[in-house]
Amino acid sequence: MEFMKQLEVWFLVGSQHLYSATTLKQVADHAHTMTSQLNEGAGLPIKIVLKPTGTTLDEISSVARDANHSEQCVGLMVWMHTFSPAKMWIPALSQLQKPLLQFHTQFNRDLPWSEIDMDFMNLNQTAHGGREFGFMGARLRLPRTVVVGHWQDEEAWSKIGNWMRIAAAIHDSRHLKIARFGDNMRNVAVTEGDKIEAQIQFGYQVNYHPVGDLVKIIDAVPAADIEALLAEYEQSYTLTEAVQAGGPLRASLYEAARQELGMKKFLTEGGFGAFTTTFEDLHGLHQLPGLACQRLMQQGFGFGAEGDWKTAALLRTIKVMGTGLAGGTSFMEDYTYHLEAGNNLVLGSHMLEVCPSIAADKPVLDAQHLGIGKKADPARLLFAAPAGKAVNASLIDMGNRFRLVVNQLEVVDLPEAMPKLPVASALWKPLPSLQTSAEAWILAGAAHHSVFTQSVDIEQLRTFADIMGIEFVVIDEHTRIPALKETLRWNEVYYKICH
């Protein structure tokens, strides 16, 4: 995501004036060294910006206020090098509106056994300074992330990097505009939702845009731009004979390229990060956008079919969260089952719109018949997802809260080819089993649409939900239905009392 290059995480080190000027200079020097080395060698996705050491209530509060108003700052990382009395932090933490990470580390990795003295003990007080700060976070009921470990350890780098991605995703969601081309699929329940509450909770700006407005832009795309995009297709994919130059369905591919360019222009110029379509509202379009949606997802846009704006928003968020990580993320639907005894599997797919970021091999580009939508044969990319770990995530509106349901998956290779299936797909074993997973998913009310990701894990999504203040339900190898039912009941009580 290009916009992440402009973002910052501010680093505030806590101390106090109880210490000598010499000690405070050492604190500042250590913080500067850490910042430089983390920026240069830790592979972090966002630049760390060191702020002056916080030694008074006013200094600390000023940084928090500035962080709130900064469009570049997506989060605040704090470290208690020495002891920093937490009452000095109350105003700052009370007003902070950005994600908070406490880095519980110390400058030295090892104790200098033969040299250690009280000067060393006086300077390196993370062990108890961090606990003082932790109390105030708990007292204020703050959602926060704690990373424990030496600042030169790769595990700590990974955790900080993932938190940065989450902070960037939250920053993005606060500004996220979602274009709904057409309304929701008629009579479908789960794709509905409270758009006002979504804007209050997440920042999502969800608005309807007539398909006719999009058609005007699509129809005005220059022929030269379409030809250039067709050349890109030919370089990127294996084209079937039907859509190659001179093929009987080449016109369908030409129209798909026109759609992609027009849709991207509409979304980019309007500042949209996500969009939805619906096959029930295609007036003026020659085909249901398939290839266009696939490629726009790969370029970072969130997408939801049939007007599913919550999944479109979540897809965009997880795309941002997965920046720089291996694996892709796509719109997905649990489509059909393989119920062989001892080998239960789910075939995930959709009519057309599966993101090629999850493709195991070079996709095949084809155009085939699609009865739904009653338009011309649409172009689409065909591929299968690679074997490995994955997660399905579904965001639903429970009326008094949003609930994020996630399921751990094991993607498997196709046991046989599916030459007659004209859509992209992923085949997986849901954990702990199909029986328990499906029952739990249904009991939790999770949608038939989901975000399928092989780049973002459950813990990242848990942190996102914690910061956002939404309910989080996990289905994994440890899930048992009686315990899940109890969790859902207790969650109901908690959200009625506390929210």
From Swiss-Prot:
SUPFAM superfamilies recorded for this chain?
A: FucI/AraA C-terminal domain-like, FucI/AraA N-terminal and middle domains
Keywords, ordered alphabetically: Arabinose catabolism, Carbohydrate metabolism, Isomerase, Manganese, Metal-binding
Q: Give me the Gene Ontology terms describing cellular component.
A: cytosol
Disulfide pattern: none
> What's the family?
Belongs to the arabinose isomerase family.
Which of this chain's residues are annotated to bind Mn(2+)? E306, E333, H350, H449
Question: Can you tell which superkingdom this protein's organism belongs to?
Answer: Bacteria
* Names of the cofactor(s): Mn(2+)
Task: Work out whether the entry's keyword set contains Manganese.
Answer: yes
- How is this protein named in the record? L-arabinose isomerase
Pathway noted in the entry: Carbohydrate degradation; L-arabinose degradation via L-ribulose; D-xylulose 5-phosphate from L-arabinose (bacterial route): step 1/3
Cofactor annotation comment: Binds 1 Mn(2+) ion per subunit.
Select a single GO molecular function from the record's annotations and give it.
Answer: L-arabinose isomerase activity
An example GO biological process term is:
L-arabinose catabolic process to xylulose 5-phosphate
UniProt-listed Gene3D superfamilies? 3.40.50.10940
User: What HAMAP family does the record point to?
Assistant: Arabinose_Isome
